[in-house]
């Protein structure tokens, strides 16, 4: 179980070999310190004097308040002057749909070239491609087209803020239950200390909605209605479909059935809204295949595929993401190991679900740095079972702080390395838990074979 620490050491050495600015290092250190400063007093809160508890809570909520003020300023600035990425793309989808245009035809977006005076990358990846989201996702974007971009952005931020607040409360209930105001403060602090939160707000992205829906699925993952949350998550971000691996391996057929039925209902609703021509254009035009190759290797992309492409100094060329041999081999290896562990785990199956979640971030070819907002769930699983981790509380705090710092660096492949490290730690804990149960439980014990 000590081998993940060697990985951390190697990564630290590699980071010191980079040309890091003082600003970058300060940002990474601040993120790590803030996280540590929240986790440690939370763990020892029952043993602290009253005045220390009050002081710690005051610092936590003061930090949250400062973050809220800064993010409010970002939102206000973007509502007044919407930046190029990403909300502008969502709003264009809505405008095309509002006039009953085909959102998957690049010709529908030519009017926006003069309106926005876009740069080359925006033109190549958006205006010359058309919508890359599947038809049922357009149910989320169509209402944006009935307002001007400023009003639409304001309403969009209201929706995302509501999702963020709901996600904070769910994080408290699921992973920090019984801790009251401490849990609420820690959940909010961990979210705001994660760089993905700031990037999500800056881009106007949908990660808060995805986080909320995944948390709802996590809460209900043993109930059939969990399939509804998965279907809605797939509507917001297509990569959520990877999470179906978990109910399939656990043979939760009702969850799978509810996911399929809910997805079909959403698809039928989008068919009625978009019309058959636009709906089937997604499948005949294959808009994602027209994306420029640099989308899969740009620095903001921290997927396994992007790391391989950058390391080899080769683009996709004429091949698609699924035609890269090294990517296929490594993806298959990670998927097989994850599947085996999920299948073997019977107790503390949260490790298995967390493994599938991290695997999704690693393998999805379009994983961007702000998708790491979802990584908070696996980290809280590790925190919840910190007695399993080498070093206990201190080892767990060190790991989480290091992951936060690596993500905040945003240098090279540091975000990918952080995600891979979390996967390795979870895999190690799952193996340890499986072997420990086999040693402790007598052969044929029901505890070992009964799903938890």
Summary of predicted features, one role per range:
Residues 6-226, 250-376, 384, 437-440, ...:
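Primarily membrane-embedded glycan-assembly and transfer machineries that use lipid-linked glycans
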Residues 227-230, 239-250, 260:
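Transmembrane-embedded, aromatic-rich helix segments that form part
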